[in-house]
């Protein structure tokens, strides 16, 4: 996948601060410390565009990134971090729900899971909520490099069983090795109804 340009646009907490709704958008959601920032950086072939942190719950805003002047990635705050107050978790939840249910240019959500962890009730509730609101979802299991290919498949099967979904619905991904990057891009572009990005050399910075 050719990345000609990728840049930070703005951060927001409410609709009045969102960028103009001019390009198709894909949001990225997942538990705190699931590897969301690393996944986005890997997709964009940028090491530090999206700030990574060893402290879960660091992302507290909706962060918008323009890619190839063709689409926008939206980094959502992570969920499930116990040390964040209930009031803050509620605030984040309302902020995310408002964005997902009202943003007309949102084409779908990449829901990020950790391949090392079998999903539970929170993930099933999330999928049910997205389905109820007619939000297309791309499921991605990160940190695949922690397992052999055989073990990856075994974990993928367990995750699919826990979520009650077909095995091939889950993308297996590694930000470290690039495994699954092209396949995930294909799903994203398909969801955004973009044939392909402009061909050329990656403009890495």
Swiss-Prot record:
Residues binding GTP, per UniProt: 30-37, 57-61, 75-78, 142-145, 173-175
Binding site for Mg(2+): 37, 59
Cofactor(s) this protein requires: Mg(2+)
Gene Ontology MF term list: GTP binding; metal ion binding
GO-annotated biological processes: division septum assembly
SUPFAM superfamilies in the cross-refs: P-loop containing nucleoside triphosphate hydrolases
Domain EngB-type G: 22-194
Pfam families: MMR_HSR1
Superkingdom, natural source: Bacteria
Function: Necessary for normal cell division and for the maintenance of normal septation.
HAMAP family recorded: GTPase_EngB
Family per record: Belongs to the TRAFAC class TrmE-Era-EngA-EngB-Septin-like GTPase superfamily. EngB GTPase family.
Protein name (Swiss-Prot/TrEMBL): Probable GTP-binding protein EngB
Organism: Desulfatibacillum aliphaticivorans
